[in-house]
Amino acid sequence: MDVLTLPAYGKINLTLKVLGRRSDGYHNLSTIFQSIALADRLTFSRCREGIRLETSGLPVPQGPENLAYRAAARLQSRYGFPGVRITLKKQIPLAAGLAGGSADAAATLIGVNALFNLGLTPGQLAREGAALGSDVPFCVIGGTALGRGRGEELSLLPPLPTLWLVLVKPSFGVSTAAVYRGWDASPGQTPMEAPDEERALAAIRRGDRAGIMASLGNDLEAVTCRLYPEVMAIKMRLLAEGAERAVMCGSGPAVFGVAADGETARRIASRLQETYPETIVTRTL
């Protein structure tokens, strides 16, 4: 194999509960991850030496600051291969809570493993990914999964009924560290709709769309909305335009609204795109 092209799918959190701060500075979470169709695209090819990363689309670093580069460097140092050229077409909004960087790292682990026949299993790749970021193991596995610990301890779940989504990313990014510091300062702040993980798990297992919808929620939403009130404004706007539910993605600032169908999602998006150019229609996988 000389060239390989892979998608790097983003994610949302259907539910996200913060269980407390750990001694290592991270936080224990319980979250239901869900892959979405919105994706970056990465092409991998062999080169004589080193790691060469070329990017297009949204602006991202091309060196060691990029998680895709760091994923390739990790496998190169641990398992050895001469060199790889990576071409990244970046489409997932940056610093949005959609795991765009983690998705690129996961695709790189998968792509380099296949290109150079390293023979690593998905479980081994997920463990390598855990050293790069908390969301990388899920992005390696994909689909629907319950995450514990930092999010890296995964239990696979049955696939969801398709949910049509309107993603809205404001013009600013959010510091994940700042959001968690805010949570530490005022733990237990109640979001507009608290996540109901047990109900969500039961609904997912029986394919109950209404039950899934009623269970959505994110413990970090109240913190991020206090720090960045526009996130709450986006949430309310999505609901006003016809979204059935609206929940913040990860630590924010992007918000996803769930629409009844694709046509409704496109209509909602058309009403928000003038104010929020980074408004995207996608669906769960």
Curated annotation (Swiss-Prot):
Keyword list, A-Z: ATP-binding, Isoprene biosynthesis, Kinase, Nucleotide-binding, Transferase
Keyword Metal-binding: no
Pfam families per the UniProt record, alphabetical: GHMP_kinases_C, GHMP_kinases_N
Pathway(s) it belongs to: Isoprenoid biosynthesis; isopentenyl diphosphate biosynthesis via DXP pathway; isopentenyl diphosphate from 1-deoxy-D-xylulose 5-phosphate: step 3/6
EC identifiers of the protein: 2.7.1.148
GO molecular function: 4-(cytidine 5'-diphospho)-2-C-methyl-D-erythritol kinase activity; ATP binding
GO biological process, one term: isopentenyl diphosphate biosynthetic process, methylerythritol 4-phosphate pathway
Catalytic residue positions: 11, 135
InterPro entries: GHMP_kinase_C_dom, GHMP_kinase_C_sf, GHMP_kinase_N_dom, IspE, Ribosomal_Su5_D2-typ_SF, Ribsml_uS5_D2-typ_fold_subgr
Top enzyme category: transferase
Catalytic activity, reaction form: 4-CDP-2-C-methyl-D-erythritol + ATP = 4-CDP-2-C-methyl-D-erythritol 2-phosphate + ADP + H(+)
UniProt binding sites for ATP: 93-103
Functional description taken from the UniProt entry: Catalyzes the phosphorylation of the position 2 hydroxy group of 4-diphosphocytidyl-2C-methyl-D-erythritol.
PANTHER family, per database record: 4-DIPHOSPHOCYTIDYL-2-C-METHYL-D-ERYTHRITOL KINASE, CHLOROPLASTIC
HAMAP family, per database record: IspE
UniProt similarity note: Belongs to the GHMP kinase family. IspE subfamily.
NCBIfam families found in the cross-reference section: ispE (TIGR00154)
Protein name: 4-diphosphocytidyl-2-C-methyl-D-erythritol kinase
Phylogenetic placement of the source organism: Bacteria, Bacillati, Bacillota, Clostridia, Moorellales
